[in-house]
């Protein structure tokens, strides 16, 4: 788990953004994952009211051909942003997702799979700026997913400064 967490340190060090990283996994059984994590997210938000964004990281369950692209350093997992629309206020999550998607394509053209909207909640009703990010898929190697993180970290930092400056 530290190996997955470590690439996120530049978000704090290089970009000056504080990062709260919750590393527990709640995906078994899969059909109860969001229900199981919901009280944890509520608690984190209650204990940290200064949080500007909540990001839920996953790997997608689709084929490698869809989730992979090649950059100079090798294959990387592509990024998909998922927004749930079955709750009031989902539009603020979509606004954040649109900004992040633009920054991803600026930082690393071709790395984004875009934004998908589903009639779900994904616990995104718990915070006004909450998004689900799929990095690669179940057929991608850990190394491919880790190669994505610096690009995503830069895009998230750029998104943070652009989105919250323009919405203040």
Protein language model features and the residues they cover:
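Solvent-exposed loop/turn segments at secondary-structure junctions
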Residues: 25-29, 59-64, 86-89, 120-123, ...
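Envelope-exposed proteins and targeting segments
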Residues: 15-18, 51-53, 75-79, 127-131
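Catalytic-core regions of hydrolytic enzymes
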Residues: 1-66
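Soluble non-cytosolic domains of exported or imported proteins
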Residues: 2-3, 31-35, 87-95, 139-147
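A short, glycine/acidic-enriched catalytic loop
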Residues: 62-89, 97
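Active-site-adjacent substrate-binding region
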Residues: 89-116
């Amino acid at each position: 788990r530290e190996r997955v967490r470590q690439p996120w340190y530049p978000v704090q060090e290089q970009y000056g953004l504080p990062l709260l990283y919750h590393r527990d996994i709640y995906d078994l059984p899969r059909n109860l994952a969001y229900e199981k994590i919901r009280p944890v997210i509520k608690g984190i938000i209650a204990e940290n009211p200064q949080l500007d964004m909540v990001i839920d990281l996953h790997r997608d369950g689709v084929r490698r051909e869809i989730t992979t692209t090649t950059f100079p350093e090798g294959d990387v997992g592509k990024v998909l942003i998922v927004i749930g629309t079955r709750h009031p206020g989902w539009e603020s999550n979509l606004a954040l997702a649109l900004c992040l998607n633009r920054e991803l394509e600026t930082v690393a053209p071709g790395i984004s799979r875009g934004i998908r909207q589903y009639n779900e909640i994904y616990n995104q009703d718990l915070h006004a700026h909450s998004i689900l990010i799929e990095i690669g898929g179940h057929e991608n190697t850990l190394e491919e997913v880790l190669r994505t993180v610096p690009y995503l970290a830069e895009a998230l930092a750029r998104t943070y400064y652009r989105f919250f400056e323009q919405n203040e």
